Structures are given as C-alpha cells and as structure tokens.
C-alpha cells in the first residue's frame, strides 16, 4: 500500500468549508483505491497573518517542501487590503511559488455537458470547449526588476519591468509540449511580439523548441486577438501557451466560458518536487460560513493532485466521474442553479459526490 503526505492549506473565506469536503472525499478515495493519505493542515493567507504576522509562515513553507503535494483552497479578504503589499494574503502565494520553484501553471477549461446552458455564451459556441492554458508563473512583469515608485518629483511615477530569458521560455514550452502530446498535439503560443521585444524573444524561442518535436502543430496569436477568439470561437484552442501577465488575464477569461469560476481547477508545477493544486476562484468572503459555496473546483483540483502529483490515476478518474454523475442528476450549488435543478449546500453536494465514489 502506497503512503502519501499532503499539506492542506484551507486559507481564508470559504476555504475551510470546501477543504472539509475535500478531506472527506480524499479519505473515501484512499479507502477505495487502497492507499494511505496523511493530510497535514497548515495556516496560510490572512489567517496566518493574524497569528504569525506573515501570510506564508516559514513552518508552513518548510512543511510544503517536504510533502508529496500541496492542496490549497483560497486566500484573501478585503480587510487585508490596507496592509503593506508583502503582508497581504496574495503575496503568500508568490512566496509559496518561489519556495517550491513553481514555474508552470496548468489550467484546464472544459465544459461539462450537464452545465453547457450555464455559460453566458450560446450553447453552440461553448459546447465543445476543452482547452488548457499553460502559463509561465514566476517570470515576466510580476517579478521583473527594476520596479517601484518615484514620488519625489512633481508628477509621481511608477514602473515595472517585463523580462524573460530564453531558459525560462524553453522550460515552460517543454511543459506545453508534454501536455499537447497527451492531447491533440496543437499549441497556440500567445504573445505581443508586434510591439514588445520580450515577446519577440518569446516567439522565437517557442518556435525553436517546438521544431524539435515533429508531432507538434504550432500557431501564434497576439494576445488581443486571443482574447477576442476565446469569446468568438473557443473550441479552436487546445493548448494555449503564454507568459505570466497574459496567462493571468486569458485564463480568467477562459474560466467564464464554463458559466461559473467555481468549477475550475488548476495546478502549479516544477520539474520535480511537490506541486500546488488549487481552485481558480477566490475566497468569496461575502458567502463564507454560510455553507453555500461550490466545492467542485476544489475537488477537481484534488483530482489533478491525485493524477499529476500522486500518480493515482484511477482515483482521479473516479472522482471526476462522481462529480459528473451528481451534476447529470440535476444537483447544483447556488452559483449553478438554473431554476430546474435541486440546489444543495456545500456539504450536501460533497456528500452526494462521496456517495457516487
């Protein structure tokens, strides 16, 4: 029997509620598929700041480095917005990514048949959407230096630097190639090479790396056009490869094709060592504690963790199938309610999914 150790970071807002559902689901899966899973819970985000004065305590980061995978719920709350930037819950995410060397963010966007009518776009536009956004995570304008404010002038200024080296682009391209080879072997690289030198390097490097794999079909698209095409004809995409800033924007745009951001998981990976698996949605403090949050994105993130992080593919498939069955039977959380479905609480839909496993 295999033994796994994961760190669970419940974080803020609805995090504890969806984490509780995830713990129950993982325990059920471990019994059914004959593996042991030790779940170590640590403070992270705003709740960690309240106790330790930092959103990412050293103890939490050290434990994350030692585990097989990290399952993260969500962080943040408007009450922390007045803190210095490095003390806000969201900065803890940057510290976690840096500590684990997580350079690749993988975000699947798939329309589940039972939810096709929840999208704000027409059914015929979204019904065949099944794409993955591969986003470079620790480079680009979010991390580039120099950066800062100039306030001792008549007109205040602020500046950031978008910078990539070819090695950073090469390694994220290799991740995209690996994923594309498991799918339809199509990559669309998104940049702004008509005006940005950094995007010119991006395009050249991606081309050079993909040419080494004759199975891969590469196309290029400017980011403004990519945003338009994701709304006009999203099913044309299979694997979208892009930089940190562009990926941040496009992945959220793609998320809303599904009708609810509460349905989408993600994974942040490195070449070796534990990855972080987390839902796309935020902490939703306005509904925290009401037991009405949608836990499915968290559960699908757990499924990605099982498949990618722990190599328990059968358990991952079992969980996804259970989710689909519950949705097909017409059960929904409030964010997915369509008037004809039965609306369940966070814990109730979790119990339904457990029953289907």
UniProtKB/Swiss-Prot annotation:
Residues with site note (Important for catalysis): 142, 192
What does the UniProt cofactor note say?
Binds 1 Mg(2+) or Mn(2+) ion per subunit.
Q: What is this protein called?
A: 3-isopropylmalate dehydrogenase
- Which EC number(s) does UniProt give? 1.1.1.85
Query: Which EC main class describes this enzyme?
Result: oxidoreductase
Chief subcellular location equals cytoplasm
What this chain does, per the entry, is described as: Catalyzes the oxidation of 3-carboxy-2-hydroxy-4-methylpentanoate (3-isopropylmalate) to 3-carboxy-4-methyl-2-oxopentanoate. The product decarboxylates to 4-methyl-2 oxopentanoate.
Entry's InterPro entries? IsoCit/isopropylmalate_DH_CS, IsoPropMal-DH-like_dom, Isopropylmalate_DH
A GO molecular function for this record?
A: magnesium ion binding
Q: Which organism is it from?
A: Prochlorococcus marinus (strain MIT 9312)
Q: Which GO terms describe its cellular component?
A: cytosol
Location in or out of the cell: Cytoplasm
Instruction: Provide the GO biological process annotations.
Output: L-leucine biosynthetic process
Q: Give yes or no: UniProt keyword Amino-acid biosynthesis.
A: yes
Question: Which UniProt keywords are present, listed alphabetically?
Answer: Amino-acid biosynthesis, Branched-chain amino acid biosynthesis, Cytoplasm, Leucine biosynthesis, Magnesium, Manganese, Metal-binding, NAD, Oxidoreductase
Which cofactors does the annotated protein need, by name? Mg(2+); Mn(2+)
* Positions bound to substrate: 97, 107, 135, 224
Do the record's keywords include Disulfide bond? no
* Residues reported to bind NAD(+): 282-294
For this protein, the record's PROSITE patterns field holds: IDH_IMDH
Q: How does it assemble?
A: Homodimer.
